A protein has these predicted regions:
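Catalytic centers of hydrolytic enzymes
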Residues: 331-561
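Short substrate-entry loop that stabilizes the transition state in hydrolases
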Residues: 62-116
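Short beta-strand/loop motif that positions the catalytic acidic residue
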Residues: 190-193
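Alpha/beta-hydrolase-fold serine-hydrolase catalytic core, especially in secreted/extracellular enzymes
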Residues: 36, 46-53, 214-357
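Gly/Ser-rich "nucleophile elbow"/oxyanion-hole loop immediately N-terminal to the catalytic nucleophile
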Residues: 60-67, 113-149, 159-165
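A domain-start/cap signature at the N-terminus of enzymes
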Residues: 29-68
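Acidic catalytic loop of the alpha/beta-hydrolase fold
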Residues: 196-201, 229
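A conserved short beta-strand
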Residues: 163-174
Length: 561
């Protein structure tokens, strides 16, 4: 049996936390049938013509005669497709859990340390399609889980593709994408964290979970007392049992969908093709009020594609379409066609045109700007950081933006055509909401000082090292010079801020719980406002408004040699 002790429930704010004591994997797994097949496979990537690996486990009862649930399990930082199968000293517990719960189990590489965004997300979707071709997969019972970075990735994919997945179980995730929280209405979530894990992880999860619960999403947050970062991976059996009990509704009569960029604009029978004001969320509320009537409520949407689902609508009849309080008309939309709605000067125009859906596994399909040359994170004053901080200020109207790349895992913005996916990849690892706070010029100068490297000390080793990673604060709205030969506390030798003036400052939300931007005496003590703007969403808005990405080095950050 499985033994569980000390179970109790308490409420913190709006979030119900379910506490579980130590859990032992007992004879329930030991009595499983003979082992199934643990296979190492690859697919050929259309992006770069390489073979990308994944591990898949086929339970002993799998014979291809019926469709099976599929659980996609994503590894953490520094891991690979084998980590969850062979690591964590758990004697293959994840495969035993898949066997006991009657599910196919696959773990992709995800292209390594990508946060499962950009090319990492593409890898997950390609593996899903590949496995569905090779094996009998129940597409209404496809699930996401993962640990740490993989838990964050599970949340990212489920919230961006609520029409694809039946449920998600992020384990020790780092953040939760609160601006997409309403997309959890159709995707049940089981978040599991360790009570002794870093505050960074708990804050990152809570901010999204609270918003999900506010809107009535089917969300559970469990905190394991006495457990740290690896605690949530100790009982895959219980996690998998929870997952396989859920089933996707492939043909909803109504839904609400939040969209941050057009890369993730499609769900069910609508596609946001163009956002009216990039950098702000677009929303779609769609309802089939009858078999021949659809009502749409759209916010910040400039162009929308509507492809009626034959399971929901009578596609042999003309469909009555309304947007807000406006009747768009009645339209016969044959197979292979879509209704394109465009907002022109505040009025909706509709036209039936050939459907042109983007491939789910396509890559770099959404050009947004151009760059005359590659923009990277190299140097004392980093050109990419100049552009990022300008985007943060533009999104929030703050006086100053502060950003550093101490955990940077991103990629340069390429020369030539810049796609939205390039913006998603340039900003990794973090993608949390932006926060604003009020600080004096004197306080800001001290923060700049706090983040200067000490020549006599080495910086903490990072799990991943990318060119340009480092602690020196990058800025917009100010300039400063530093001299590392000066004594600590006096190394910032010039700064153009008024020490007595109070400024509105924008930062990434993660710095409020993880001292990556060394806030000194303000860490976990300063009052701040959480904006509804995601980090990557701000970059998309800035790129779309300018159309050209070509930041200069302007002397914002200089070292005295």
């Amino acid at each position: 049996m499985e033994a569980a002790t000390g179970r109790r429930t308490r409420h913190v704010g709006r979030v119900a936390l379910v506490w579980f004591g130590a859990v032992l994997l007992g004879s329930r797994l030991a009595g499983a049938a003979a082992p199934g097949q643990d296979l190492r496979q690859t697919y050929r990537s259309a992006i770069d013509d390489t073979d990308q690996p994944y591990r898949i486990y086929l339970p002993s009862a799998y014979d291809g005669n019926r469709a099976w649930p599929l659980i996609i399990a994503m590894h953490g930082t520094g891991g690979n497709e084998a980590t969850l199968f062979d690591g964590y000293e758990n004697d293959g517990a994840i495969k035993k859990a898949a066997e006991a719960n009657g599910a196919l189990l696959v773990s992709p590489l995800g292209r390594g340390v990508t946060e499962f965004r950009g090319i990492g997300e593409n890898d997950i979707l390609c593996v899903l399609e590949e496995v569905a071709k090779r094996y009998r997969v129940d597409r209404d019972r496809v699930y996401l889980t993962g640990h740490s970075m993989g838990g964050t990735g599970a949340a990212y994919l489920a919230l961006h593709h609520p029409d694809l997945f039946a449920a998600a179980a992020p384990l020790a995730a780092a953040y939760s994408f609160p601006w997409l929280a309403r997309n959890a209405a159709t995707v049940p979530f089981l978040w599991i964290s360790g009570a002794k894990d870093s505050d960074f992880y708990m804050r990152g999860v809570l901010v999204g979970v609270e918003r999900m619960l506010k809107f009535g999403g089917p969300v559970t947050l469990e905190v394991l007392p006495g457990e740290g970062h690896r605690g949530p991976v100790q009982d895959f059996h219980r996690v998998f049992a929870w997952l396989v009990a859920r089933k996707r509704d492939p043909h909803p009569q109504s839904y609400f969908f939040e969209v941050d960029t057009p890369v993730h604009g499609s769900a069910w029978w609508t596609t946001v093709e163009k956002i009216a004001e990039p950098g702000r969320m677009a929303t779609v509320r769609a309802e089939a009020t009858s078999r021949t009537t659809v009502h749409l409520q759209l916010e910040n949407v400039a162009e929308l594609g509507f492809t009626p689902d034959p399971a929901v609508f009578d596609v042999e009849q003309a469909l009555a379409v309304s947007v807000g309080n406006t009747e768009a008309g009645r339209f016969k939309i044959p197979a292979g066609q879509a209704l394109r709605l465009s907002n022109v000067s505040g009025r909706w125009r509709a036209e039936v045109k050939p459907a042109q859906p983007k491939a789910l596994t396509g890559f770099r399909q959404f050009p947004v700007a151009t760059a005359p040359e590659e923009i990277d994170m190299v140097g004392t004053e980093k050109r990419l950081a100049n552009w990022i901080t300008d985007a943060m200020r533009a999104a929030t109207q703050a006086d100053i933006a502060l950003y550093n790349a101490v955990y940077y895992r991103g990629l340069p913005i390429p020369a030539g055509t810049v796609d939205i996916v390039d913006l998603i990849q340039c900003s990794r690892p973090f993608d949390e909401e932006l926060v604003t706070l009020r600080l004096s010029g004197r306080e800001i100068r001290q923060m700049l000082e706090n983040n200067l490297p000490d020549p006599g000390k080495s910086e903490p080793a990072l799990a991943v090292n990318r060119a340009g990673a480092g602690p020196i604060v990058q800025v917009s709205g100010l300039r400063y010079k530093f001299d590392l030969k000066q004594p600590a506390g006096r190394r910032v030798v010039e700064c153009n801020l008024d020490p007595d003036r109070t400024y509105t400052v924008v930062m990434e939300g993660q710095v409020m719980a993880r001292d990556t931007l060394r806030l000194g005496a303000h860490f976990k003590k300063v009052n701040y406002t959480t904006t509804p703007i995601g980090f990557t969403t701000a970059l998309y808005g800035h790129a779309a408004r300018s159309g050209v990405i070509n930041p200069a080095r302007e002397g914002r950050v200089e070292e005295v040699r």
